[in-house]
């Protein structure tokens, strides 16, 4: 199968969030399964220069002229390879749009021309597919930044020889980010205004690029089975639950996998000691002591160490941490926070660290090495999200034997099995899970974890249950292949029956 994946970011070329990890790991898994995969992303020179382990890229002879509204925009095409794979990567190089400090925002403000930038990128993907003669069986677009691609394929690409049966799959990674713009930006797309209607591209008078992808793609996916159900409800659908409900038969939830070449305690180069499920107690003890020492916390092997690596926002449940912080810090615990986000929560966590230096460490910003060390060195991991389409850190935690404490939403509900008596007896439990979005409920579950942490055999069983499951992309990639086959089948004409067939 020939597959083109289009994404606004992908590790190791650029990254702002989990989309970048998925856009890299899924193509590699598909290629390992024998498929011909091409990845197309923008080239962000300033970000690329700062990416650790960024691979070399080279110029190609291909130059694109892309229509954006009434003007033509020139771009170069660079070429690289996803490390550890045979996945070809084409990077669209257009400095006016992409040679910036950020991908979508700068100084906490969205770029005012984001619509124009990603309309350009979507059209550049189509032009690259044509000029490179890729002839894909399926084009897989991701989130609002590439939401125009399914519409362009439906309206324009099907007129091209060899591309008339190309199918489209559109993945929703987070309903909260929809790419909503002034209605007059519709002219940038180059599509007829007849498509600016409530069934396709219009949302309460605005152009909505996420809705565009949802409307035009042959098959839709999102990043966990539970989230696929949630987004068809008013609570989680962010205003698009109606159109998602109307396409329920075309919507598939697939839990993301983990790139275990990067995230695995047996091979992780950032750890004080590598370990496996067979020596988890010894390995994690060494990693815990190293983490406590690095962060200036007292090295106490028997105190439960809770960690968080996250955007510090309300969506990630930091309001709950604030609600229960005082009573939590009355307990004999240590807390480690790594991340950035809402200044209110950054200040809260800085203040907790200043007031309780023997119990709390707060690092504002992102550090790849430290994020691995937090996953390996902590005993438990906090993810009390208000909503969570998939989540990756809870799966990293399970792989590393770090017991997750999560709210049962989205992918968290699909990956973490609560340590109830029944689940423990069945050997299924791997963490702690709760439903109410309240600080006292989070605190109660942290107390549950503290109590079970003192019961070493039961705690070890929780760790080993999580570590023994295959969290890699192998199974998720196979599910995507079935989705691609389904999309392709919708675009292939039914064979005509001969006269003697009944």
Can you describe what each PLM-predicted range is?
Residues 1-502:
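Catalytic cores of nucleotide-sugar-dependent glycosyltransferases that transfer UDP/GDP/TDP-activated
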């Amino acid at each position: 199968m020939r597959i083109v994946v289009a994404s606004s970011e992908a590790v190791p070329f650029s990254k702002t969030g989990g989309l970048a990890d998925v856009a890299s790991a899924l193509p590699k898994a598909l290629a390992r399964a024998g498929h011909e995969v091409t990845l197309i992303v923008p080239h962000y020179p300033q970000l690329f220069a700062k990416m650790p382990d960024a691979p070399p890229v080279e110029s190609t002879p291909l130059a694109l002229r892309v229509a954006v509204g009434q003007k033509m925009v020139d771009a170069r095409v660079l070429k690289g390879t996803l490390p550890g794979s045979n996945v070809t990567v084409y990077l669209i190089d257009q400095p006016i749009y992409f040679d910036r400090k950020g991908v979508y925002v700068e100084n906490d403000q969205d770029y005012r021309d984001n619509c124009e930038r990603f309309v350009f990128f979507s059209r550049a993907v189509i032009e690259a597919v044509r000029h490179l003669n890729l002839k894909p069986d399926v084009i897989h677009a991701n989130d609002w930044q590439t939401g125009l691609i399914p519409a362009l394929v439906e309206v324009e690409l099907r007129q091209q020889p060899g591309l008339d049966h190309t199918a489209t799959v559109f993945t929703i990674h987070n309903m909260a980010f929809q790419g909503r713009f002034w209605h007059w930006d519709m002219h940038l797309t180059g599509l007829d205004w007849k498509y600016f209607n409530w069934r396709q591209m219009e949302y309460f008078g605005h152009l909505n690029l996420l809705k565009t992808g949802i409307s035009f793609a042959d098959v839709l996916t999102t990043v966990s089975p539970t989230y696929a159900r949630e987004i068809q409800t008013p609570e989680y659908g962010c205003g698009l639950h109606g159109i998602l409900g109307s396409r329920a038969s075309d919507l598939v939830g697939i839990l993301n996998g983990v790139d275990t070449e990067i995230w695995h305690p047996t091979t992780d180069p950032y750890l004080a000691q590598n370990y496996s499920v067979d020596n988890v107690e010894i390995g994690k003890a060494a990693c815990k002591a190293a983490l406590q020492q690095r962060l200036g916390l007292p090295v106490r092997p028997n105190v439960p160490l809770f960690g968080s690596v996250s955007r510090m926002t309300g969506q990630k449940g930091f309001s709950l941490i604030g609600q229960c912080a005082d009573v939590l810090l009355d307990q004999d615990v240590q807390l480690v926070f790594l991340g950035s986000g809402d200044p209110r929560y950054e200040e809260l966590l800085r203040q907790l660290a200043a007031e309780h230096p023997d119990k709390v460490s707060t690092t504002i910003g992102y550090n790849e090495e430290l994020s691995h060390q937090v996953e390996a060195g902590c005993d438990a991991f906090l993810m009390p999200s208000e909503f969570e389409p998939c989540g990756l850190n809870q799966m990293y935690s399970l792989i590393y034997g770090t017991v997750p404490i999560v709210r049962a939403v989205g992918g968290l509900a699909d990956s973490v099995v609560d340590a109830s008596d029944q689940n423990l007896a069945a050997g299924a439990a791997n963490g702690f899970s709760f439903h109410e979005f309240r600080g006292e409920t989070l605190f109660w579950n942290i107390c549950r974890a503290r109590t079970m942490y003192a019961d070493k055999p039961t705690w070890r069983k929780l760790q080993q249950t999580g570590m023994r499951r295959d969290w890699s992309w192998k199974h998720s990639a196979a599910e995507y292949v079935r989705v691609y086959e389904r999309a392709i089948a919708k675009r292939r004409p039914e064979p005509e029956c001969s006269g003697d067939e009944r």
